[in-house]
């Protein structure tokens, strides 16, 4: 569990003289091919785990490593793979997708939502439930329906100098007004309501597409949100807007967008047909996954710089903790293990070692994986045409705040 000291078990004999160790090497969950790859990962450690799991169930199929140009292609492929298995008669709940953090799964969430695949997120907050996304969507809610009191309340409270009392008073003056232009004119006379906040709504209402409206609102609110979330993973939050922007391209109006993804969200289990509430894909953070298992497991974005994560590379102990994290993810699979990754890297570029004290560690855990342990499928194109153009995370300046990716 998080925060535990593995040395308590690893050095148990030293700490408890006269004790004996009984090794439980028979594994009842996974097939031998999955365990062979997991055993190989632990075997690369400088720590002497001396742990070789044997599958009670015998042999199965080789794990696969699927490599993509970027996270959007990675997410799209996973969704198509899920749909193929569904068409073959499988249930959604036979699939589990493991990710490091909620932020790292946003492109995947967008693809699941767009494809109307029901899912539950364990260990993280869903895309449309995050505060920064709700903040921007409050503007779209007002533009679509000027009588949306909750939308007005959330939007006005984003701006400095406006508290609950001021916002409530202002809203009471426009609550029965079905014209956004008239509401804006009334609020312009309120001393504490900024003209900038109203101009964003005005410009957004003039947009010809949902995507254009969304971009106007994000652009206008950018500094306000940056200040609000400057110490709360702002750089990661920006990337969520790229996912929403892509989803906004699938609808013809703001109201249709809100109805599709906010008012009647297909990603909630409550939206499933009666009797199928549990038939959902599980998206789960690895730190929440101990004890979990599933027929088919996808381990998301096992890319260079991610396993081990870059910031762990100044400590051998941290690198070994990263190894155990990946080991936990891989051993959740019962029948099929699919590891996905993305980026423009080669085997040579990711195979270098890092020296820490008197030991050398891998910069990337899968850099020298043995061919007999897995099947490699490289989906990358010769050129990177599918990268997001004009994405919010690229088009806006990076914050100066140091970001903790966890």
Model-derived features with residue positions:
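Helicase C-terminal subdomain and adjacent C-terminal extension
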Residues: 344-406
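Conserved RecA-like ASCE P-loop NTPase motor core of nucleic-acid helicases/translocases
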Residues: 24-26, 63-70, 78-129, 136
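Conserved helicase C-terminal RecA-like lobe
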Residues: 137-368, 372
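Conserved RecA-like helicase ATPase core segment
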Residues: 1-68
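Conserved nucleotide-binding/hydrolysis micro-motifs of P-loop NTPases
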Residues: 4-7, 27-32, 60, 72, ...
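Short glycine-/polar-rich loops that comprise or flank the Walker A/P-loop
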Residues: 16-21, 60-63, 93, 115-117, ...
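Conserved phosphate/pyrophosphate-binding and hydrolysis machinery centered on Walker-type P-loop NTPases
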Residues: 27-31, 55, 68-75, 98-102, ...
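A polyampholytic, Gly/Pro-enriched intrinsically disordered region
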Residues: 43-45, 73, 137-159, 386-404
């Amino acid at each position: 569990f998080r925060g535990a000291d593995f040395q308590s078990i690893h050095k148990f004999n030293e700490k408890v003289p006269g004790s004996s160790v009984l090794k439980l090497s028979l594994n009842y969950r996974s097939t031998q091919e999955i365990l062979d790859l997991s055993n190989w990962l632990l075997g690369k450690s400088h720590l002497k785990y001396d742990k070789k799991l044997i599958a009670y169930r015998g042999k199965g199929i080789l794990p696969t490593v699927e490599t993509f140009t970027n996270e959007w292609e990675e997410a799209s492929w996973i969704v198509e793979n899920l749909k193929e298995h569904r068409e073959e008669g499988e249930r959604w709940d036979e699939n589990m997708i493991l990710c490091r953090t909620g932020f790292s799964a946003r492109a995947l969430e967008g693809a699941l939502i767009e494809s109307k695949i029901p899912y539950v997120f364990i260990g993280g907050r869903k895309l449309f439930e995050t505060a920064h996304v709700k903040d921007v969507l409050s503007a779209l809610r007002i533009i679509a329906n000027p009588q949306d009191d909750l939308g007005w309340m959330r939007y006005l409270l984003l701006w400095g100098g406006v508290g609950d009392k001021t916002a409530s008073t202002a809203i009471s003056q426009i609550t029965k007004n079905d014209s956004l232009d008239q509401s804006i004119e009334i609020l312009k006379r309120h001393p504490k309501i900024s003209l900038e906040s109203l101009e964003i709504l005005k410009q957004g209402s003039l947009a010809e597409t949902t995507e254009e409206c969304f971009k106007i609102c994000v652009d206008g609110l950018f500094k306000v949100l940056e200040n609000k979330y400057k110490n709360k993973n702002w750089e990661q939050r920006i990337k969520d807007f790229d996912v929403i922007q892509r989803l906004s391209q699938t609808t013809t109006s703001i109201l249709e967008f809100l109805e599709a993804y906010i008012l009647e969200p297909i990603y909630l289990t409550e939206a499933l047909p009666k009797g199928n509430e549990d038939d959902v894909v599980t998206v789960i953070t690895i730190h929440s996954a101990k004890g979990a298992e599933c027929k088919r497991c996808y381990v998301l974005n096992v890319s260079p710089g991610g396993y081990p994560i870059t910031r762990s590379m100044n400590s051998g102990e941290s690198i070994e903790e990263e190894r155990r994290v990946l080991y936990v993810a891989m051993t959740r699979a019962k029948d099929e293990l699919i590891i996905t990754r993305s980026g423009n890297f080669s085997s040579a570029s990711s195979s270098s070692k890092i020296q820490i004290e008197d030991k050398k560690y891998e910069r990337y855990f899968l850099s020298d994986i043995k061919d007999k342990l897995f099947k490699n499928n490289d989906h990358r194109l010769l050129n990177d045409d599918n990268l997001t153009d004009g994405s919010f995370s690229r088009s806006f300046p990076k914050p100066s705040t140091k970001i903790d990716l966890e």
